[in-house]
Amino acid sequence: MELRHLRYFVTVVEEQSISKAAEKLCIAQPPLSRQIQKLEEELGIQLFERGFRPAKVTEAGMFFYQHAVQILTHTAQASSMAKRIATVSQTLRIGYVSSLLYGLLPEIIYLFRQQNPEIHIELIECGTKDQINALKQGKIDLGFGRLKITDPAIRRIVLHKEQLKLAIHKHHHLNQFAATGVHLSQIIDEPMLLYPVSQKPNFATFIQSLFTELGLVPSKLTEIREIQLALGLVAAGEGVCIVPASAMDIGVKNLLYIPILDDDAYSPISLAVRNMDHSNYIPKILACVQEVFATHHIRPLIE
């Protein structure tokens, strides 16, 4: 049995069709069918139910599929890590969500550069969900994100829980709560601007889930492309916007930022790495996180 046989089988399962899998794998359909039959003969089990369209996996086939996916994932990770170790001049590719640039991430990266001048750093903007795929494919080595996305191949380290704020125009009627804060239930009738409109799940879907978990339904939601535009529209009186506290540093004029008092009104900032990756740059970047947080009197969640 070779890795290509596992890859063929996994593709057929995921495409639910021999013809679609053959097209995706860029091979003819008859040879692919023969390879699947040979795999069944070698294993001594039937992987697919006969006569079903779309292709239906047997119970034994599904068990084998789950393990085949793990084998292919681990093999890809091992290959990626081996290539990196063999590279004389080490390059560290760091994925990040753009909103973190308004917080402490730039200080963390700068400190890491100063302490590790031998490591070349490439910064790659990508959403939290995209970071998971990029990590598994070896396109990035670390990912700084905000969303809680689980994957068996990825280890997620929560660094900090950043408070959420409600951005309003300084003359908005909710300005009376600037010092005391508001609950989400108090703002469901306000025109609400959400960002971004990129691939979901994203920060907008995260905010919507906070309302859903409390049984609340905002009356008017408008999705905006990015945080700067959303805050600019708030300054123009178009509505209100929920943002991480670090967004205050963007510096849009005529805005107030009101604390949101609900228990889960925070945005987790996390570092994502491959489960099999035990490279020394991971503890080094975590040490930089702790050092930068300490200068800002923030207690990190890592030890």
Swiss-Prot record:
Induction pattern: Negatively autoregulated.
Protein name listed in UniProt: HTH-type transcriptional regulator CatM
InterPro entries found in the cross-reference section: HTH_CatM, LysR_subst-bd, Tscrpt_reg_HTH_LysR, WH-like_DNA-bd_sf, WH_DNA-bd_sf
Assembly with partners or alone: Homotetramer in solution.
GO cellular component: protein-DNA complex
GO biological process: catabolic process
Start-end of DNA-binding region: 18-37
Keyword Protein transport: no
Record's keyword terms, sorted: Activator, Aromatic hydrocarbons catabolism, DNA-binding, Repressor, Transcription, Transcription regulation
Binding-site residues, cis,cis-muconate: S99, T128
PROSITE patterns xrefs: HTH_LYSR
Family designation: Belongs to the LysR transcriptional regulatory family.
Gene Ontology terms, MF aspect: DNA binding; DNA-binding transcription factor activity
Protein's UniProt keywords contain Transcription regulation: yes
Xref: Gene3D superfamilies: Periplasmic binding protein-like II, Winged helix-like DNA-binding domain superfamily/Winged helix DNA-binding domain
Primary role: Positively regulates the expression of catA, catBCIJFD and benPK in response to cis,cis-muconate. It binds to the catB-catM intercistronic region, to a specific sequence upstream of catA and to the benPK promoter region. Can also repress pca genes.
Domain (HTH lysR-type): residue spans on this chain: 1-58
Gene responsible for this protein: catM
